């Protein structure tokens, strides 16, 4: 009996077969029933119970934060260059960096929507994560062991079982071929993890918003990868360029994609362009 023969995971297996990971075995990413110790064994036992009692469906199954971190560690085994780039950049920020930033906390108190971009897979509420009594300098993480956890893992922007047909396994591609696959706008390798739904939405299914500079419409890139970036690097509710966290390119750079200038994993510049973003 294999994973693919069990009807509960048929849809996931079909996606896997047509994905860039089709040459990777299920156990290489998910482990075995025993690899997660007692916790993993209890989970698999629960799945067997659900199978026979019909009390759980495919849609009810999702990864908790511990499992997401474990999968991200396994991503790094093959995606070593991407892991190194991520570790060197801002997207590897931790819970401590985000939620213990006193200066930022004085301007805006941490609340539930922070998890939309920072800590998407956190299992609890902001009050489970932090003690918010007193002044900003008194606020702290309730569990100190969570301080160095990454606030944005691989699965924040990537869907493992994403339908992205490949004519060559990713691990067999050279650096140039990998770069092409990462910036492919026809079948992007990115997806937005929606915390509220506990599901991924492929980047090419996201809405291409309209941005404004005063009364003028500013063209937004046609690259779905840029639409994903805009979910967190977002403008105010009037969609004004340079407002809030918006980084929409303007002027000579209008219509360019984030990936035209930035490494997708480190977020660092890969060219000499400057003054691309207008800041309000």
Go through each PLM region and give its residues.
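Short sequence/structural segments immediately N-terminal
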Residues: 1-280
